[in-house]
């Protein structure tokens, strides 16, 4: 059991090292895309399933409340938090539409969809991205594996941050770290002199 614990830590560290080499440009581009959208008075819609939903909620909470420093609230909505809306849509329109219907209702040109999917193949996330495209929104996608169907939907203005791993647990860990990096970059760009 102790050896298995060491393996988990070692794999996580190795994935972080690989990501630190492969992802800084994509993370920086995503952060600047998010910052520019916020400066233009737009909002960020976030979605994911399971652990990805938790990461989406963490991002939205860090925008609305704060990340590490006190600052004005920033407009972000986690689409996976309203159980009444989610179950109403799932019951009437099938599960695949739980985020797409919200994107069509709440999203506007210039807004961002932060779509988080470990494999990039979750039907409800893919449908949300398709809906965002029809609303002239920009997509920031956090994926893993080969990027899945989601990667094929992205245009030149969109940003994919694909974790270099084929292990779901490692991808999810790196998604959380990536969300934290994005929050840090947004805060330090918009509010460079804020104190803790």
Curated annotation (Swiss-Prot):
The keyword NAD does not apply. PROSITE patterns: SIS. It comes from the Bacteria. Residues 34-196 form the SIS domain. GO terms for molecular function: carbohydrate derivative binding. CDD domains: SIS_GmhA. InterPro entries: DiaA, GmhA/DiaA, SIS_dom, SIS_dom_sf, SIS_GmhA/DiaA_subfam. Keywords: DNA replication. Required for the timely initiation of chromosomal replication via direct interactions with the DnaA initiator protein. NCBIfam families: PRK10886.1 (NF008138), PRK13936.1 (NF010546). Homotetramer; dimer of dimers. Belongs to the SIS family. DiaA subfamily. This is DnaA initiator-associating protein DiaA. It comes from Enterobacter sp. (strain 638). The lineage of its organism: Bacteria, Pseudomonadati, Pseudomonadota, Gammaproteobacteria, Enterobacterales.
